[in-house]
Amino acid sequence: GSNINQLNLNAPEFQNFFAACEALNLSVLIHPWEMMGQEHMEQYWLPWLVGMPAEITRALCSFIFGGLFDRYPKLRVCFAHGGGNFIGTLGRLEHGWSCRPDLVAIDNPNPPSSYLGRFWVDSHVCDSEQLTLLVKKLGADKVIQGSDYPFPLGESSPGHLVRNSGLNESVQNSIFNSAPKAWLGI
């Protein structure tokens, strides 16, 4: 999950888990669940449409600002749904990090952009321009095929977005083949 009992993933209670995953050479998939603020999003399927991307962004920011990528440098982590809103809010995160280090950089002195390429995201973003942006920002070697199957927002024909995105064959091959292998450590 993207949180555990509403605790961010950088909470002290979870450090033994991440240390064990790194020591055992395991891959970790972070998928949103139990979205924050659900009680305020009762209509229009907003927990699924707005809450899930926000929840994944929360998890990814917990990893970055909480120093988990530095603490566990060999840990292979993939964030579902293209990393949520992370890429779209990266400029804001960077700005917050630089203008309010007293609030943002308290557990990690490195800017959020320094972690681009340090984690994987899946391709399930439902939009070819967003997928292209992920590849541009993270690199094709950090985007893996995602479908969100069997959930209702899942891609009905897994791989359709990647195959019809206009990305070249080499990039598509990375998303379908070499990037997932690298994330899985095979």
Q: Language model features by range: what are they?
A:
Residues 75, 121, 128-144, 150-186:
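Mid-to-C-terminal alpha-helical segments outside catalytic/metal-binding sites
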Residues 1-138, 142:
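Catalytic pocket-lining loop regions of alpha/beta-barrel enzymes
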